[in-house]
Amino acid sequence: MSKISIGQIEAAYEKGVAVHLGKIRFSEAVESLHIDHAMNAASAADYVGNVGNLLNGRVYKRTFNLTAAEYFLSRIAKDFPESFLSAAISAIKLHIEYYRSVSKTNLPQLAALCDRYLTSGVLKPVERTRLSAEFDSETENALQMSAQQ
């Protein structure tokens, strides 16, 4: 599997946003990334789907690289209202918990990226407090579920 380039990450973000906004179909976005940007079709589908999951605050189960996470968060912060950045951070934290439950790996660099956004002042204090409380609660629940297994 070849490494996904920054150009492919940028294109995947643009296509993912276009799908999210209803401007193009998911299949068109994937095909365009595959043909126009030489991106593996499965990776293209994962990245486009993950952009939508970030914007909607939903857990995503197909991982993407740290460079993509950094790029996606920076663009969401620039392109959308604060609530979308909050949703994206929530989605990443949910992914971290999901990944921890299936692989026993903590994804510390991804968690640090979220922490940087939470402490950077980009989000209003009330949003930072809410997201930190949610993350603490989700972590406690995951630890309890792990202990029961």
Go through the PLM ranges and name each one.
Residues 139-146:
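Long, compositionally biased low-complexity regions that are usually intrinsically disordered
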Residues 56-74:
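Short Lys/Arg-enriched helix C-cap and helix-to-coil transition segments
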Residues 34-46:
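Short, basic interhelical loop/turn and adjoining N-cap
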Residues 39-40, 57-61, 80-83:
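Short acidic, glycine/proline-enriched loop segments that cap or flank alpha-helices
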Residues 80-139:
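Helix-turn-helix/homeodomain-like alpha-helical modules used for DNA recognition
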